[in-house]
């Protein structure tokens, strides 16, 4: 775990991380345990526990979660099946994404995620519209 992320976790007394495959990208997501608990509570608050489909959604969402501990040297062991899910073979890259950390195969981040022109246009659209949902 890179030092800047470790410092933030230590400052917030986070000792465990929740690991999950990203829903949309070929990467893994590390949540500080408190952030994961908040996100899980939000999801559960939107689900009806008496609706079988909602129970399937919750089950699917939490089924691939792994709890990781960070050792004294800032290391954590990511299980092999997660590395395979994210196509990670050698070098990895950590990307801070607001209140969570994405873990990528470095070779997947060597190119921009979006073409610069597409990115600038999309960002302009998001930042200049009253409803930022498209």
Protein language model regions, located:
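Charge-rich (acidic/polar
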Residues: 13-19, 55, 87-88, 92
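Short conserved catalytic/interaction loops centered on acidic-Pro-aromatic/His motifs
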Residues: 84-106, 112-113
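A positional/architectural concept
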Residues: 3-27
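Short, Lys/Arg-rich amphipathic alpha-helical interaction segments
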Residues: 106-134
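Helix-adjacent hinge/juxtasegments
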Residues: 29-67
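Beta-rich strand-turn-strand
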Residues: 66-75, 80-89
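Short, basic amphipathic alpha-helical segments that act as recognition/interaction helices
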Residues: 21-28, 33-36, 100-109
């Amino acid at each position: 775990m890179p030092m800047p992320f470790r410092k933030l976790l230590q400052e917030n007394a986070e000792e465990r991380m929740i690991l999950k495959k990203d829903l949309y990208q070929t990467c893994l997501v590390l949540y500080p345990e408190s952030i994961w608990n908040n996100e899980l509570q939000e999801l559960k608050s939107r689900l009806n526990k008496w609706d079988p489909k909602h129970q399937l959604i919750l089950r699917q969402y939490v089924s691939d979660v792994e709890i990781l501990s960070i050792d004294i040297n800032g290391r954590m062991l990511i299980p092999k099946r997660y590395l395979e899910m994210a196509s990670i073979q050698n070098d990895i890259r950590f990307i801070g994404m607001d209140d969570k950390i994405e873990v990528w195969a470095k070779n997947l981040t060597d190119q921009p995620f979006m073409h610069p022109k597409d990115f600038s246009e999309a960002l302009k659209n998001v930042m200049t519209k009253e409803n930022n949902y498209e």
